[in-house]
UniProtKB/Swiss-Prot annotation:
Binding site for Mg(2+): 253
Keyword annotations from UniProtKB, A to Z: Aminoacyl-tRNA synthetase, ATP-binding, Cytoplasm, Ligase, Magnesium, Metal-binding, Nucleotide-binding, Protein biosynthesis
Descriptive protein name: Phenylalanine--tRNA ligase alpha subunit
Top EC class for this record: ligase
Record's cofactor remark: Binds 2 magnesium ions per tetramer.
Organism: Legionella pneumophila (strain Lens)
Gene Ontology biological-process entries: phenylalanyl-tRNA aminoacylation
């Protein structure tokens, strides 16, 4: 019996050494240790042995099972390591291969213009403030001295909600809210989206505007003129002639519209400026006393000036774009130029 047990152990050991994969190794386990395996059959034959032989033979068979199990476990670890290494070798990535190209994005031309404007005015100590795009009639009209019969308050010019609120038509409400919260003197600009019922080559229902405001005891129209002259020279990178034309805005008095020398023809006259040599770029003026009174600022002590200009318009002039709608069509071929 001892010889038979040793023979089975040797057979199992040799078979385990020859196993080349996990499936073959599992079959060896079944052949020697399974329900019908060779060692299991020996245990079944213990019933035919004498009472003295049973314990000895049973102990030897169990030792053989433990030895074979240990060999199988060791071989299993070895085969799994080889299998993993083979898989890694098959899936190896060549890090020297060139990577896949990804197109890089860029800032939208209007965003670039906004950054240039913010950079200029922040250097002069202006705060950059923002406010809600859904406004009340008080902040959008009444506090700005725009009466109920003014055309700007008509349905065909302003987007109204059912509850009487509206999409702001300018960023002036931001200035009103700021004046309510702060004590003068202060200076600020308010860039943001605004909305009006208009759509053509030079107008869109949504556009970008930036407005500036300064409240101080020494604010003058001459100071505003000098600031705007310096700003446009900075923005376009060269000296430009400015022209102030008398105008009317409910929230400023006196009011003016500002033209700059045409950037396309240097004031000589072309299609862009309709052969006038001038391009209209903004409206401005001294803050109306009624606006100051609406926010509890004494107009006898403080004065202010304000201006407003379209950032989309400036982007068109700066980059030579002739159709405003191109800025909003999300054409990557067009936008990648900037």
């Amino acid at each position: 019996m001892l010889v038979l047990i040793n023979t089975i152990q040797e057979q199992a050991s040799e078979a385990i050494k020859q196993a080349t994969d996990i499936v073959a190794l599992e079959q060896i386990r079944v052949d020697f240790l399974g329900k019908k395996g060779k060692l299991t059959e020996l245990l079944k034959g213990l019933a035919n042995l004498s009472a003295e032989e049973k314990p000895k033979v049973g102990q030897l068979v169990n030792q053989a099972k433990q030895g074979i199990s240990a060999l199988i476990e060791t071989k299993m670890i070895e085969l799994k390591e080889k299998q993993l290494l083979a898989k890694l070798a098959a899936e190896q990535i060549d890090v020297t291969l060139p990577g896949r190209n990804h197109s890089t994005g860029s800032l939208h031309p209007v965003t670039q213009v906004k950054h240039r404007i913010n950079d200029y005015f922040s250097r002069l100590g202006f705060d950059i403030v923002e406010g809600p795009e859904i406004e009340t009639e008080f902040y959008n009209f009444e506090a700005l001295n725009i009466p109920g019969h003014h055309p700007a308050r008509a349905m065909h010019d302003t987007f109204y909600f059912g509850d009487g609120r509206l999409l702001r038509t300018h960023t002036s409400p931001v200035q009103i809210r700021t004046m309510e919260q702060r004590k003068p003197p202060f200076r600020l600009i308010a860039p943001g989206r605004v909305y009006r019922c208009d759509s053509d080559v030079t107008h869109t229902p949504m556009f970008h505007q930036v407005e500036g405001l300064l409240i101080d005891k020494q604010a003058t129209l001459a100071g505003l003129k000098g600031l705007l002259q310096d700003f446009f020279s900075y923005f376009f990178g060269r000296e430009l002639a400015l022209r102030f034309r008398p105008s009317y805005f409910p929230f400023t008095e006196p009011s003016a519209e500002v033209d700059i020398e045409c950037t396309q023809c240097n004031g000589k006259g072309c299609r862009s400026c309709k052969f006038t040599g001038w391009l209209e770029v903004l409206g401005c003026g001294m803050v109306h006393p009624n606006v100051l009174i609406a926010v509890n600022i004494d107009p006898n002590e403080y004065h202010g000036w304000a201006f407003g200009m379209g950032m989309d318009r400036l982007a068109m002039l700066y980059y030579g774009i002739d159709d405003l709608r191109m800025l909003f069509e999300n054409d990557l071929t067009f936008l990648r130029q900037f």
